[in-house]
Amino acid sequence: MDNENRMLYPMKFIPVPGLRDWGGNAMLTSFGKKLCVPDGRRERVLTADDRVGECYDVADLGYIDSMIDNGWFGGNTLSELMNTYLERVTGERAFNWYGTQFPVTVKWIDARDRMPLRVNPDDDTAAQRYDAFGKTALWYVAEAGEDAALYLGFASEVSASDFYAKCNDGSVDELLNVVRPKKGDSFLIKPGTVYSARGVVLVEISEASELSFVLHDPYGGDTQLGEAFDLIDFGPFSACCGECCGDRDGDCCCHGHEHGCEHSHCGEHEHCQERGHDDRSAVKLAVCPQFTASGIRLDDPMHIYCERFGSFLIYTCVEGEASLQTASEDGKRTEQCVLRRGETVLVPAEVPDFFIVPRDKDTFLIETGLSDVEDDSEECCGHGDCGHDHEGCDHDCGEHFGDEPEDDDFGVDAGWSPHIYN
């Protein structure tokens, strides 16, 4: 391919919608997405009358393969990008572990009505039974209606026989832990946790897997209760993160203490607090072996050095609008990728550094990457070096380890600077 030696760049993808009985129209109305579905040999443009339950922004799932929508690699799919550019996309450590499989999926969920109750397998079970990844997922609440509800696990320990009976007679809600979410809440859904939702728009960050099983469908659809029965955790649900309280290994959901954490000190521990950050810093939402996610309130430009992360980065715009700005290939001018509300952009690991500049007030982004599981240092959202410059760092001390790199260390000409919007 003629472009194999060209520098990669921030990439946006054509969103892939999924029509669902329980879906709504928020993707089209509130978030302004332009969505199409196959209709014979043609495509049909979706309207506000269509019920879009899911919308995949970044996915390498085989049956869903995101197509790049900008730049010189536009028109190619994410799997083609991976097969061509390998570790230049994901980073060397991620490539050594995942190969040409892109490791993370980003999608939106619009549950205007009640979703079916589901459960996800863990990685070991999924590998043994289905030769696939399991599914750990983060839900971030982008919008919540007056009747919003999340159904996460059980209110108290239940017996398998009671659960089975109530799934079959339609009264399973009596057993479930019900959370009344508000905009900005986040929840880590671990394998084995039964889950559903109603009246919310969610951003879901997950492993590259859609392997899940329907336990109860309020619309009378097919279920896989028997196949998934031994996957279910029948204990009471706890939203408390593992890293903050120390008794749930490897998982973090730093906002879980607002919704039923049983630890009295939760919210006072240094990991539960949004510690040392200001409106420009990355606030940890989740850290687990499969991915890491942070929320960024973007009031001022941020300069991010990708080499400190060692992996790709993904940004999803929940509110406002931003511009990702990189140096051109000759290093003498600025190239921009505008990120509007409801859009997602992938920054390949090869991109040395870039600026994120707000184009609107109250801009809020979700930043997704990979945890450096081989590094014992877990500062700044799970990374040894968080990648943000001094203004955006959320270390307790407010400073980074060491000095910022010189411009030419990252191949950026000293004359390149970001465009600031007034």
Annotate the PLM regions.
Residues M1-V158, Y219-G250, Q273, A293:
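Transition-metal
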Residues Q101, I109-R114, D123, A144-D147, ...:
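Ligand-binding loop in jelly-roll beta-barrel domains
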Residues V106, M115, A137-Y140, V178-V179, ...:
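His/acidic/aromatic-lined binding-pocket segments of jelly-roll/cupin-type domains
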Residues V141-F163, A282-L285, D300-L313:
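Short beta-strand/loop turn elements enriched in aromatics
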Residues L152-E174, V203-G242, I366-G382, D409-N422:
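Double-stranded beta-helix
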Residues L176-L188, S196-A197, A327-V351:
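Short acidic-glycine-tyrosine-enriched beta hairpin
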Residues C240-H277, S377-D408:
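Histidine-centered metal-binding segments
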Residues H303-I304, G320-T326:
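Short beta-strand segments in beta-sandwich/barrel cores
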